[in-house]
């Protein structure tokens, strides 16, 4: 009877592992054949303005003047861009988009496929037609600067630790780790989106 119970538990364990594997995202190693990709990203600065218009600007991106005044939200869908006049709006200096770092136009795309392409990036075939939006999360890039406010860190796996020579900030802290200042106030939790300070 004990053998049947062990066998049943073993089958449940194997089934659970199978379901985890099926649920996990695995991309094939085949290469895509994209001509280019578009990833709407923040561009320009008050001192180094971009050349665009509200018509040509990407949906989801906000456009600002050099003094920080909101001008407009872009109205062009990267999957089906607007046909717009070819001039620069002198009022627009920079944009703020959900994605901030990296190239806006990806060309060449290398071995990118729909599966390995980044979410929020749009990929186009050799004929210029929209193929797909990427499905993978883009790796987070963190600054290497130390946050001088951090005095202690509490991680679920290690407990409370005093920070001495360790260089840490809200971006590079392990997921779930809470960073505290000298007063014991929570600064942030690692692995969570941080608001711009």
From Swiss-Prot:
Sequence repeats lie at residues 24-80, 81-140, 141-196. Keywords: Disulfide bond, Protease inhibitor, Repeat, Serine protease inhibitor, Signal. GO terms for molecular function: serine-type endopeptidase inhibitor activity. Induction: Locally induced in leaves subjected to different types of stress (TMV infection, wounding, UV irradiation). Residues 1-24 form the signal peptide. The keyword Ribosomal protein does not apply. Disulfide bonds join 27-115, 31-111, 39-121, 51-88, 54-72, 55-84, 61-97, 114-132. The record marks 29-30 as: Reactive bond for trypsin. The keyword Disulfide bond applies. It comes from the Eukaryota. InterPro entries: Prot_inh_I20 (IPR003465), Protease_inhibitor_I20 (IPR051391). Belongs to the protease inhibitor I20 (potato type II proteinase inhibitor) family. This is Proteinase inhibitor type-2.
């Amino acid at each position: 009877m004990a053998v049947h119970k062990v066998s049943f538990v073993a089958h449940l364990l194997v089934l659970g592992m199978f379901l985890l594997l099926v649920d996990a995202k695995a991309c094939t190693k085949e290469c895509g054949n994209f001509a280019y990709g578009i990833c709407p990203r923040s561009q320009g600065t008050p001192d180094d303005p971009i050349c665009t218009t509200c018509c040509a600007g990407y949906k989801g991106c906000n456009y600002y003047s050099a003094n920080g005044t909101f001008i407009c939200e872009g109205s062009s869908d990267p999957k089906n861009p607007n046909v717009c006049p070819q001039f620069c709006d002198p009022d627009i200096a920079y944009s703020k988009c959900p994605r901030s770092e990296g190239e806006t136009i990806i060309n060449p795309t290398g071995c990118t496929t729909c599966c390995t392409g980044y979410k929020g990036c749009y990929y186009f075939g050799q004929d210029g037609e929209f193929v797909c939006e990427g499905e993978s999360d883009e790796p987070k890039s963190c600054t290497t600067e130390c946050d001088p406010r951090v005095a202690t860190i509490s991680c679920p796996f290690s407990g409370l630790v005093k920070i001495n020579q360790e260089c840490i900030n809200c971006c590079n802290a392990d997921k779930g780790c809470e960073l505290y200042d000298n007063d014991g106030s929570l600064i942030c939790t690692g692995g969570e989106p941080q608001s711009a300070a």
